[in-house]
């Protein structure tokens, strides 16, 4: 007796059917428990928080010799005061200059030739004005300095431009001054020392100065005497600029602007920066030095002196790095922030990242890191520096970010500063490099461990999950997992990310649509079959994908070797679980239900869930039902496991058997072993676990369509148990129990059992108490009573006088639409109830009411007269 809804699905075998798939609503959530084929839920694998902050935790597959250290010593001597780029080892050939500019003036004073003046860029004028304004601000806060040259002691600290020395028909450029050879030698004798690019002083030797010179074209011969000009850096083109003179003349406005900015920087340096550096050199109490560092950072920022173009950078670095040895975490963070702002590179970048990493290992320093906005500086390193050149620096930078990402106090800052986008971009760079070059970057696997661990901490946020979908992060993670499938740590972290993401419908749908993920997950299961921490998460992900998407069930099952992979995994962990089982006499009886599942049990729980979910697909379910290996392991699980041993595993295995028993196919192992399965279910029926009882009754609902199983039910008094369950006042249990009784009443010989156990009254009570809120259950009750009353001659003799009158009253009122649907439901639930009332309950109830009315007399019997 199927409802119109059931008939539309075109499947007449089971006694109840799943509802038509549609967008999930609150009404559909209620009806899910009624489906003959049901998905199975489970908990996400637990990931304990690491006790210590390290690059690689205790569960890492890396050996101590095969990974970068988390502990190291770091001192001022670790840093380099010179942070210039390495000099190329290739000697370039001199360029033959053929300038197209007019011949040079004959006067030596005009060797810095004058070119036609193009219109001055207004933006450049503004920059010069700003530089001048900065000078006036600095001067107003300190004693006003002379407008021209600095005192001799200070001028020695001024960084000059590169030296250009030419021999014969050449010229010499020293500290921005072009000199002839003879004048240059005199200049060197009177100025033997100069400040080098790295901030140190060096002595210029004549032979070094004139080494490797080249001759100049005629227009540069007889160069003018620059002694009349002030020594200002870059006031004339350097040797590296000469090659550009063929096509481009240097505008005089640019030279004037550069002169002004350099002059302003010198004044600002001496009036604002030098006094702070002197304060730092005193190394008084930590609070004073920290305050001075903060003041220094603000001053450098105000003077626009941050970055790798700043000329006093080496002197500044030397002063700052010296303070690292003080050993104060708060001071070191302030030093690190300034050093990073100076755009250091190579060894210094690595060491400053190590310094922050070392501090961030202590959770107590999280507040210091947050107060100093160190996160922003670290993200800037990842955003702006070159990945290949600075892989090790990136590693420790990411290690620090990973540590603080575990602190919820940083979550909003990380999201707002673009951490998610930056980290996914890093993964993308690594993926693209492998695709382009076919090789792995050194230490890229170590870096990916830190990146993926950080993302794992962040994906609990709905904002982060939304960003993942917007920037297509899931395919990038799958690609990284595929390329680094030999790195268990990377794969485990990405599996943890997917475990969290697929617990949400939108993310689960996005991953399910990436068709390559199924083969990837199967490969990981085959590769790491005995690595429980990875396998359990991969299987959990597959369970999520197949629970919410029928297309995912189909795609997974079509992957080569998918069922065999699941079977092999089932066998592996079944054996591990058997070996870990204690003898019955040694098992503790107290608090057994509270014992968490073992590692092997946890994998089996997730695995049976996948089997139950994919069995819903009509193309997969019959295949699984006919697989002796799958069915055999499920039955073995019920044989040696009790609800007290592992409740979730037993219930999942039973739910899987229920879904497989739905398919009435010739080669079904379930059908061949139906009586043995019925025996195994008896121990669940007599348990005190309501979930276990419910799953067992559901299986009996499918199996009881077979005549032999019905005989087994009656012989073992299972029908009495089903009638007793009608008193449970639990809608799902009553629904399933009523389904078994309905199947029993198909056999005319077994209809009488309803009267023997008071079944009719229990069915009527169930209709009265639960019918108005569950029209599907009310429909099943009416179907059962319809089957029972097939050969009715008199309603009262069939149902009993009291139950007949109750049925007439209930059916009449339940068939009144206004009375039946006058419930306080939200619109969604109201439509749901109306649908099932109209399509399922009303047709059957109307026929039953008509039958009772036809065979019932309303004449009351006359009382027996008394004599």
From Swiss-Prot:
ARM repeats: 262-301, 304-344, 363-403, 408-449, 462-503, 506-547, 551-589, 591-616, 619-662, 664-705, 707-746, 748-790
Disordered: annotated span: 1-115, 214-252
Effect of residue 760 to N: In SPGF38; uncertain significance
Keyword list, A-Z: Differentiation, Disease variant, Repeat, Spermatogenesis
Polar residues: bias regions: 18-28, 40-50, 60-69
Keyword Repeat: yes
Low complexity bias spans: 70-81, 234-243
InterPro entries assigned to the protein according to its UniProt record, in alphabetical order: ARM-like, ARM-type_fold, Armadillo, ARMC2
Keyword check for rRNA processing: no
Gene Ontology biological process: cell morphogenesis; cilium organization; nucleus organization; sperm axoneme assembly
Tissues expressing this chain: Expressed at higher level in testis.
Function: Required for sperm flagellum axoneme organization and function. Involved in axonemal central pair complex assembly and/or stability.
Disease: Spermatogenic failure 38: An autosomal recessive infertility disorder characterized by asthenoteratozoospermia. Spermatozoa exhibit multiple morphologic abnormalities including short, absent, coiled, bent, or irregular-caliber flagella.
The name this protein goes by in its record: Armadillo repeat-containing protein 2
UniProt source species: Homo sapiens (Human)
């Amino acid at each position: 007796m199927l409802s119109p809804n059931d008939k539309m699905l075109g499947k007449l075998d089971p006694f109840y059917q799943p509802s038509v798939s549609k967008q999930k609503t609150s009404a559909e959530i209620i009806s899910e428990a009624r489906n003959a084929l049901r998905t199975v839920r489970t908990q996400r694998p637990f990931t304990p928080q690491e006790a210590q902050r390290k690059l690689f935790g205790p569960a890492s597959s890396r050996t101590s010799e095969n990974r970068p250290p988390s502990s190291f010593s770091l001192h001022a001597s670790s840093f380099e005061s010179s942070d210039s780029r390495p000099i190329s080892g290739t000697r370039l050939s001199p360029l033959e200059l053929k300038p197209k500019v007019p011949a040079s003036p004959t006067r030596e004073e005009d060797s810095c030739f004058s070119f036609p003046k193009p219109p001055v860029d207004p933006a450049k004028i503004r920059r010069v004005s700003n530089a001048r304004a900065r000078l006036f601000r600095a001067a107003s806060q300190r004693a006003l300095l002379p407008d021209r040259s600095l005192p001799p002691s200070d001028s020695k600290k001024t960084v000059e431009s590169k030296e250009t020395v030419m021999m014969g028909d050449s010229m010499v450029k020293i500290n921005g001054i072009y000199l002839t050879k003879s004048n240059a030698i005199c200049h060197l004798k009177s100025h033997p020392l100069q400040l080098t690019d790295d901030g140190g002083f060096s002595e210029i030797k004549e032979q070094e100065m004139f080494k490797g010179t080249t001759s100049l074209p005629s227009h540069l011969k007889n160069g003018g005497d620059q002694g009349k000009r002030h020594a200002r850096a870059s006031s004339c083109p350097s040797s590296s600029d000469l090659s550009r003179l063929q096509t481009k003349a240097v505008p005089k406005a640019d030279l004037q602007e550069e002169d002004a900015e350099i002059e302003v920087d010198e004044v600002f340096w001496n009036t604002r920066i030098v006094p702070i550096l002197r304060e730092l050199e005193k190394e008084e109490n930590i609070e004073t030095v920290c305050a001075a560092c903060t003041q220094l950072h603000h001053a450098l920022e105000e003077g626009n002196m941050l970055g790798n173009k700043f000329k006093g950078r080496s002197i500044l670095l030397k002063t700052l790095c010296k303070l690292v040895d003080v050993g104060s975490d708060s001071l070191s963070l302030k030093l690190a922030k300034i050093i990073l702002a100076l755009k250091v590179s190579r060894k210094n970048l690595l060491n400053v990242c190590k310094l922050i990493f070392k501090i961030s290992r202590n959770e107590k320093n999280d507040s210091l890191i947050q107060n100093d906005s160190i996160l922003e500086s670290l993200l800037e390193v990842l955003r702006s520096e070159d990945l290949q050149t600075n892989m090790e620096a990136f590693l420790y930078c990411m290690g620090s970010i990973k540590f603080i990402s575990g602190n919820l106090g940083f979550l909003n800052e990380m999201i707002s500063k673009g951490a998610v986008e930056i980290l996914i971009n890093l993964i993308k760079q690594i993926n693209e490099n492998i695709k382009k070059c076919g090789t792995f970057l050194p230490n890229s696997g170590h870096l990916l461990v830190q990146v993926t661990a950080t993302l794992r901490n962040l994906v609990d946020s709905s904002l982060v999950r939304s960003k993942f979908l917007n920037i297509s992060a899931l395919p990038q993670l799958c690609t990284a997992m595929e390329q680094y499938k030999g790195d268990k740590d990377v794969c485990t972290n990405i599996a943890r990310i997917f475990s969290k993401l697929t617990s949400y419908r939108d993310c689960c749908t996005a991953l399910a649509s990436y068709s390559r993920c199924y083969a990837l997950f199967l490969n990981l299961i085959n590769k790491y079959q005995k690595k429980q921490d990875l396998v359990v998460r991969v299987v959990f992900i597959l369970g999520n994908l197949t629970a919410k998407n029928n297309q995912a069930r189909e795609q997974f099952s079509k992957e080569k070797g998918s069922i065999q992979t699941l079977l092999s995994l089932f066998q592996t962990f079944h054996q591990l679980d058997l070996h870990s089982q204690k003898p019955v006499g040694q098992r503790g009886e107290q608090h057994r239900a509270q014992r968490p599942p073992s590692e092997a049990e946890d994998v089996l729980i997730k695995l049976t869930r996948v089997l139950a979910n994919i069995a819903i697909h009509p193309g997969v379910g019959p295949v699984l039902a006919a697989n002796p290996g799958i069915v055999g392991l499920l039955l073995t699980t019920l044989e040696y496991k009790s609800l007290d041993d592992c409740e979730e595993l037993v219930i999942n295995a039973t739910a899987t058997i229920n879904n497989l028993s739905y398919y009435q196919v010739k080669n079904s192992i379930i059908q061949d072993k139906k009586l043995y399965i019925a025996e195994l279910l008896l121990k669940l029926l007599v348990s005190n676990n309501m979930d276990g009882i419910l799953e067992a009754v559901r299986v009996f609902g499918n199996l009881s369509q077979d005549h032999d199983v019905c005989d087994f039910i009656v012989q073992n008094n299972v029908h009495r148990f089903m009638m007793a369950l009608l008193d449970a006042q639990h809608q799902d249990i009553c629904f399933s129990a009523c389904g078994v009784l309905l199947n029993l009443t198909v056999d005319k010989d077994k209809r009488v059992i309803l009267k023997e156990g008071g079944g009719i009254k229990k069915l009527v009570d169930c209709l009265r108490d639960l019918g108005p809120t569950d029209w599907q259950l009310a429909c099943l009750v009416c179907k059962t009573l319809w089957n029972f009353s097939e050969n009715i001659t008199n309603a009262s003799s069939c149902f009993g006088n009291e139950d007949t009158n109750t049925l007439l009253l209930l059916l009449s009122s339940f068939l009144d639409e206004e009375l039946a649907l006058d419930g306080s439901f939200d619109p969604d639930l109201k439509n749901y109830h109306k649908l099932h009332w109209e399509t399922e309950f009303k047709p059957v109830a109307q026929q039953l009411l008509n039958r009772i009315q036809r065979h019932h007399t309303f004449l009351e019997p006359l009382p027996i007269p008394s004599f």
